[in-house]
Design a protein with these regions (language model features):
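Globular "head" domains of long coiled-coil molecular machines
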Residues: 1-222
Length: 225
C-alpha cells in the first residue's frame, strides 16, 4: 500500500496489532479498552486517541511498548488507497512464534472473523515445525490463506527455499499459494516508474490475490447471501 506503517525485523517486532482501512486522508488513532476483556470490542467501552500517522510504529513496536505494557487494543490507520476502497481491511499482527505464544493466541482469536490470512516470513529459511503447526490450526479457522516470503532481494537462494516451503505446505495438506516479495524493489520501482522492477518485486501478485481472491470472493459471497 506504499506506506511504511508497520515495523519490520528479524525477531518479533510488534507487540500490538495495527488495523489499516480506507480513509479520505491519512490518519491514525490508538484504541484502548475502558472495560473488561469481554467488553473490549464494544465501541462504547473504548477510548480513541488520535496520533500522527507517521508515529504508529512507535506505539506498536516491541522495543517501545514491550509486551504491550501500554495496554492498547490496537492501532487503527486510515489511508486513501484503491485497494482498501471496496472495504478491505488489513490487520498486521505480532509474530506468532508458534501455537503456544500469547501473540499466536491473539491472532487465532481474530481469525474466525477474517476473510483471509497472509502468513508472512522472510526468504532466508524454510518453515519450522512450529510455523507449520500454527498454519494447520489457522487454516481450520480461516481457509482462505496465502504465504508471503519477504526480503527476496537479500536472499539469492530464495526460490529454492520457496520450493522447499511449498513442499512442506503440500505435505501438511495446506492448500495455499506462496509469493516472494521485496518491499525495497517495490519502493525503487515506484520511485523510478520501472515496470519490470515492479514485477520483480512480487508485490503486484500479492495485490492481485487480495483483489480477486479476497475482495472479489467476499463481494461474491455477499451478493449470494
Amino acid at each position: 500500500i506504499n506506506a511504511p506503517l508497520c515495523p519490520v525485523g528479524t525477531d518479533i517486532t510488534t507487540s500490538v496489532a495495527t488495523m489499516v482501512s480506507a480513509g479520505d486522508a491519512p490518519s491514525a488513532e490508538l484504541v484502548y479498552s475502558l472495560g473488561t476483556p469481554e467488553e473490549a470490542e464494544d465501541p462504547q467501552r473504548q477510548r480513541r486517541v488520535p496520533i500522527p500517522i507517521e508515529r504508529v510504529g512507535e506505539f506498536v513496536c516491541q522495543a517501545r511498548n514491550p509486551d504491550n505494557e501500554a495496554r492498547l487494543l490496537y492501532a487503527h490507520a486510515r489511508l486513501p488507497r484503491s485497494l482498501l476502497a471496496d472495504g478491505l481491511t488489513l490487520v498486521d499482527t505480532p509474530g506468532v512464534g508458534g501455537l503456544n505464544s500469547a501473540h499466536a493466541a491473539a491472532t487465532m482469536s481474530a481469525l474466525p472473523q477474517a476473510d483471509a490470512l497472509l502468513f508472512v516470513s522472510d526468504g532466508s529459511a524454510e518453515y519450522s515445525s512450529a510455523e507449520l503447526e500454527f498454519l494447520t490450526t489457522a487454516l481450520r479457522l480461516c481457509p482462505n490463506a496465502a504465504a508471503v516470503m519477504t526480503k527476496i532481494d537479500l536472499y539469492p537462494d530464495w526460490e529454492r527455499i520457496a520450493e522447499i516451503n511449498r513442499g512442506h505446505l503440500a505435505a501438511a495438506g495446506l492448500a495455499m499459494p506462496l509469493f516472494g516479495v521485496s518491499s525495497r524493489l517495490r519502493e525503487a520501482a515506484v520511485a523510478t516508474r520501472d515496470a519490470q522492477l515492479n514485477a520483480e518485486s512480487g508485490i503486484e501478485a500479492v495485490l492481485a490475490h487480495l483483489r480477486v481472491d479476497v475482495v472479489g470472493n467476499a463481494q461474491l459471497l455477499g451478493a449470494r447471501a
